[in-house]
């Protein structure tokens, strides 16, 4: 799934690995961006939830700002840490397990999304719909390219 996404910069190592590699500042910048992304998700939900329904396309503004990879990573992190919570749909929890989020000395708890789980579940579904649309468009473009060859 990640291979077809635009090349969005994400630092792949834990803080300990970054320290060992002499790249701690790069890790810190990535970590701060993960935290900001989690905050942007909370703000988008606050903006687009009317008390009963989450506005369609709520995830798009956050995706436009932070990219598919980072938004997916931050969402997966929250669902993985809340795997016990029955308010998340099983398909969303299963999706979250397809994304590797390393244990990082407790740092991953810092970019945990604090929105209500039932509403966040709707945001995750909206994100996944956006991702599926991207995949469909990418597949269609590849098919069109094959037809012109």
Regions found by a protein language model. Name each.
Residues 1-148:
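Gram-negative host-targeted secretion-system effectors, predominantly Type III and Type IV
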């Amino acid at each position: 799934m990640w291979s077809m996404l635009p090349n969005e910069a994400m630092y792949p190592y834990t803080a300990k690995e970054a320290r060992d590699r002499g790249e701690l500042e790069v890790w810190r910048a990535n970590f701060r961006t993960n935290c900001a992304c989690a905050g942007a998700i909370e703000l988008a939900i606050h903006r687009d939830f009317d008390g009963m329904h989450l506005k369609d396309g709520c995830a798009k503004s956050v995706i436009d700002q932070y990219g598919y990879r980072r938004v997916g990573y931050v969402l997966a992190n929250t669902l993985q840490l809340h795997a016990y919570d029955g308010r998340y749909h099983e398909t969303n929890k299963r999706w979250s397990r397809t994304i590797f989020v390393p244990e990082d000395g407790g740092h991953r708890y810092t970019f945990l999304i604090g929105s209500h789980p039932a509403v966040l579940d709707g945001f995750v579904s909206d994100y996944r719909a956006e991702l599926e649309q991207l995949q469909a468009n990418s597949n269609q473009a590849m098919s069109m390219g094959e037809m012109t060859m």
